[in-house]
């Protein structure tokens, strides 16, 4: 009887850890009452991705500029949204790549200033302003791993990092100079670069934390203006609705020595341990 009770407890714990690892790293609640306008020069937006079809951009023109509330000083840069329209009964997934500071529509709590390509899916341009839209956040359908670039004009003593090609937004970027023992958190600027004012010549580690609390690490040999690296990982989007299918987890840059350490790694370890124990108990029962 005691063994049976233990077995049931273990089974419950196992299911708990399964459901824990399948929680989307951000809220996907449906928001209604959103509106949209369009603009025609979406390149070089405030999120720092430059040309949308260039190396830092999403590789397509399905983007939006967010009003101050949604833009949130850059915190929603790189977030993707699935927006549905009652005008066409269609939906479109866009990435936030810009801010929309204009007084007027952009000051609403949920307003998207869309590229014409995205707007056209949701309604005719002649309508001007689309009202009554609904949306929810979704992971971005990017290919390969999270990437990092050091800002134009970086030098041995100052740099700023742009994190891009991520499926989810970034909560924190920290730097540890080689030989030091602690990471220092950087400040995210409103133009989406993480400012690192206390660099020294030589190598350093960067720790990138997703909004879901998952970490990606990369070692960079030295500060170099506009130098880009692909890390060896992508953030997990297990449990998210609207996860785009397609290739993911491409090849990492072999020279950078990046690695990943995640809470879900820990919970799957727990899972394996619990499974082994459960099987052990089953064997003992027989
Ligand atoms: C969209 O769907 C609603 C509800 O099903 C329907 O009444 C409306 O005619 C549809 N509109 C278009 C443009 O298809
Ligand atoms: C966007 O949301 C709508 C409504 O929930 C859904 O039907 C559609 O499949 C979603 N699109 C994508 C690409 O996830």
Swiss-Prot record:
SMART domains found in the cross-reference section: DPBB_1 (SM00837)
Family: Belongs to the expansin family. Expansin A subfamily.
A Pfam family hit: DPBB_1
Source species: Dictyostelium discoideum (Social amoeba)
NCBIfam families the record matches: expansin_EXLX1
Residues of the Expansin-like EG45 domain: 44-145
Sugar-modified residues: 82, 89
Organism domain of life: Eukaryota
Function (record text): May serve to lubricate the movement of the cellulose microfibrils during cell growth and wall extension and/or they may serve to maintain the fluid state of the slug cell wall.
Protein name listed in UniProt: Expansin-like protein 1
Keyword set, alphabetical order: Disulfide bond, Glycoprotein, Membrane, Signal, Transmembrane, Transmembrane helix
Membrane-crossing segments per the record: 266-286
Membrane topology recorded in Swiss-Prot or TrEMBL: Single-pass type I membrane protein
Recorded GO CC terms: membrane
InterPro entries reported in the protein's UniProt record: Expansin/allergen_DPBB_dom, Expansin_CBD_sf, Expansin_CellWall, Expansin_EXLX1-like, RlpA-like_DPBB, RlpA-like_sf
Disulfide bonds: 47-77, 80-140
Signal peptide (residue range): 1-21
């Amino acid at each position: 009887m005691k063994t049976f009770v233990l077995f049931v407890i273990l089974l419950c714990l196992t299911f708990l850890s399964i459901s824990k690892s399948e929680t989307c790293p951000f809220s996907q609640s449906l928001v209604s009452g959103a509106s949209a306008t369009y603009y025609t020069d979406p390149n070089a937006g405030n999120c720092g991705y430059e040309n949308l079809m260039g190396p830092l951009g999403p590789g397509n023109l399905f983007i939006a500029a967010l009003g101050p509330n949604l833009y949130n000083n850059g915190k929603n840069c790189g977030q993707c949204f699935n927006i549905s329209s009652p005008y066409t009964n269609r939906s479109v997934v866009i990435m936030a790549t810009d801010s929309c500071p204009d007084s007027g529509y952009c000051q609403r709590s949920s307003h998207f200033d869309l590229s014409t390509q995205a707007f056209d899916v949701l309604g005719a341009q002649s309508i001007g302003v689309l009202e009554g839209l609904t949306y929810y956040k979704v992971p971005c359908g990017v290919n390969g791993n999270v990437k990092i670039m050091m800002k134009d004009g970086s030098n041995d003593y100052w740099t700023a990092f742009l994190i891009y090609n991520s499926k989810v937004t970034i909560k924190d970027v920290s730097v540890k100079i080689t030989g030091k023992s602690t990471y220092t958190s950087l400040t995210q600027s409103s133009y989406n670069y993480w400012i690192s004012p206390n660099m020294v010549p030589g190598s350093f580690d960067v720790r990138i934390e997703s909004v879901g609390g998952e970490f990606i690490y990369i070692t960079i040999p030295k500060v170099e203006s506009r130098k880009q690296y692909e890390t060896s990982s992508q953030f997990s989007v297990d449990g998210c609705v609207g996860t785009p299918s397609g290739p993911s987890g491409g090849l990492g840059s072999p020279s950078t020595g990046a690695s990943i350490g995640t809470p879900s790694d820990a919970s799957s370890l727990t899972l394996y341990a619990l499974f082994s124990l459960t099987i052990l108990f089953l064997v003992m029962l027989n």
